From Swiss-Prot:
GO terms for cellular component: plasma membrane. It is a multi-pass membrane protein. GO terms for molecular function: G protein-coupled receptor activity; olfactory receptor activity. Residues 1-55, 106-129, 191-227, 289-307 are extracellular. Keywords: Cell membrane, Disulfide bond, G-protein coupled receptor, Glycoprotein, Membrane, Olfaction, Receptor, Sensory transduction, Transducer, Transmembrane, Transmembrane helix. This is Olfactory receptor 13C3.
């Protein structure tokens, strides 16, 4: 977890430098003659340079999207209709599952359509909507992962006070604050990005309207965007990760103090799925944005294609793994899934 914390701090620094460098390049271009006709739509480049890969990519992403819908949908239904799951942990898990469905549905369907129809243009308003939902879901997920870590900390380190600290009012409020904060953050970032003038180049070198890719096309000062994104990263990436880090430090200390091997194993099993999701989530973000800049000079086109495939892992594979990890590592979830599928009582 210490490595994850350091990685995220590095991500912040590199992310800010990356956007600032892009702005410097745009500022230099503005000194020349640029077509000042404001763009009314954007063109999503995707993997247009690799037509053979696109076919494989379409089939792969379609299968994964169906798994996301089914897997997370089953977890949501189980958390609602099974009384065994009316607890803070499964309430947060249900929220995370719903978030994963919303997050992927904001970009995957349009990506699939563009791959099969070769229609890659997206309207200005459509890009804004896609950017808003993508950023909102990402921000909310960071907060939810932090809330889930705090839930595990209270359950393991303060079990007697767990019903009091994590009362129904408390955990519903925690989830609501996560959603509201993520939405407000995304609205601010989206409005600041889409208020910028976009002239000349309208090609987004990405599968979706990712905010950093869009900012590169702006032909105006983006200093305010940089400042707000740094603040946003601190609030929605670093702070939740610090909560996760310290929660697991206390959890680890408590587990090591247990005399029973069975108790230690049971305590760790309740955290392993969440910890795995956190490592994948933050690890992928770090790998996407904190790679050494020197690598961009060698095989830039291939590296850009690799970055897009990594973004697939971040945007599709992680939401797909969430229900799988929680189902495989949790007997209650597996029993509930069997109950929903077979409609037989759970013993």
């Amino acid at each position: 977890m210490i490595v994850q914390l350091i990685c995220t701090v590095c991500f912040l620094a590199v992310n800010t430098f990356h956007v600032r460098s892009s702005f410097d390049f745009l500022k230099a271009d503005d000194m020349g003659e640029i077509n000042q006709t404001l763009v009314s739509e954007f063109l999503l480049l995707g993997l247009s340079g690799y037509p053979k890969i696109e076919i494989v990519y379409f089939a792969l992403i379609l299968v994964m999207y169906l798994v996301i819908l089914i897997g997370n949908g089953v977890l949501i239904i189980a958390s609602i209709f099974d009384s065994h799951f009316h607890t803070p942990m499964y309430f947060f898990l249900g929220n995370l599952s719903f978030l994963d469905i919303c997050y992927t549905s904001s970009s995957v369907p349009s990506t699939l359509v563009s791959l099969i129809s070769k229609k890659r243009n997206i309207s200005f308003s459509g890009c804004a909507v896609q950017m808003f939902f993508g950023f909102a879901m990402g921000s909310t997920e960071c907060l939810l992962l932090g809330m889930m870590a705090f839930d595990r900390y209270v359950a393991i380190c303060n079990p007697l006070r767990y019903p009091i600290i994590l009362s129904k009012v408390a955990y519903v409020l925690m989830a609501s604050v996560s959603w509201l904060s993520g939405g407000i953050n995304s609205a601010v970032q989206t409005l600041l990005a889409m208020r910028l003038p976009f002239c000349g180049n309208n090609i987004i070198n990405h599968f979706a309207c990712e905010i950093l890719a869009v900012l590169k096309l702006a032909c105006a000062d983006i200093s305010l965007n940089i400042i707000t994104m740094v603040i946003s990263n601190m609030a929605f990436l670093v702070l939740p990760l610090m909560v996760i880090f310290f929660s697991y430090m206390f959890i680890l200390y408590t587990i090591l103090q247990m005399n029973s091997a069975t108790g230690r194993r049971k305590a760790f099993s309740t955290c392993s799925a969440h910890l795995t999701v956190v490592i994948i989530f933050y690890g992928t973000i770090f790998f996407m944005y904190a790679k050494p800049k020197s690598q961009d000079l060698i095989g830039e086109e291939k590296l850009q294609a690799l970055d897009k495939l990594i973004s697939l892992f971040y945007g599709v594979v992680t939401p797909m793994l969430n229900p799988i990890l929680y189902s495989l590592r949790n007997k209650d979830v597996k029993a509930a899934v069997k109950y929903l599928l077979n409609k037989k009582p759970i013993h």
